[in-house]
Amino acid sequence: DKMLSTGKYDVLAVVHNETSTGVMSNLDEISDLLSSKYPEVIWLVDAVSSMAGIKIEVDKLGIDFILSSTQKAWGLPAGFSICAVSDKIIKRSKVMKNKGYFFDIEVYEKYFNKFQTPSTPSIPHLFALREVLNIIKKEGINNRWKRHKEMRDYVIDWVQNNGQKLFSENGCHSNTITCIENTQEWNIDNIYNTLLLKGFRMDRASDAIFRVPDFFINRTTLDDAVFKGRVVATQLAREGDKKVIDELLGK
């Protein structure tokens, strides 16, 4: 609010769901601020790791441009983007200069109205996306939002019951990615390498934090992963890293 009140800015860019930290921005609060005080400001939202996993009412919120990618909550390989634009940003695009070609919304609008694309897209992604949309339709969109939140809560309970700490503050926890502070100083490299041999791929960004994805899985698959993780933990204990494993098992 302080920065926008200067009148120097005509665009606000927001990361809805920060993948690295598991922090989710409150879009409702931002929407209320913009609609009440700065309706002329263009609002851009990065929803790469939230779209299809967290409910985002684009029109109701007044988002002008929202962009996502398929490798997160959509459950598809990387290499394909999905976006939605408002009438306001289309009108703004028509009077802008030096837009280039590949990011010119007018070009996309022209082809969109003919049910075409400016260039050949990734056809396998389109077929895969159609299948995911069928899965979402079968599950029910509200059930999908509910499932992701339940998975988030399930992981948070596990974190708290095992003596670790969430990186994000209360009220800012993401529904699709949980970031955990390694307050007990577990040997992340050791855990990573052992889990990898058992078919689990774990984030190894640093020893300070590690992350658990809450999207495109359900309680059954997580229960199975936790059980197998305990089996791996037992094996690690036999191999000598007992301190790490006692902590993993909550001892």
Task: Show the residue positions of the predicted features.
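A short linear hydrophobic-aromatic micro-motif
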Residues: 164-168, 200-205
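Active-site C-terminal subdomain of aminotransferase-like
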Residues: 71-157
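PLP-dependent enzyme catalytic core of the Aspartate aminotransferase-like
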Residues: 208-251
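Hydrophobic alpha/beta core scaffold segments
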Residues: 189-202, 208, 217-220
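Conserved active-site segment immediately N-terminal to the catalytic lysine
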Residues: 59-71
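Active-site phosphate-binding strand-loop segment of PLP-dependent enzymes
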Residues: 1-50, 65
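Conserved PLP-binding catalytic core of the aspartate aminotransferase-like
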Residues: 165-194
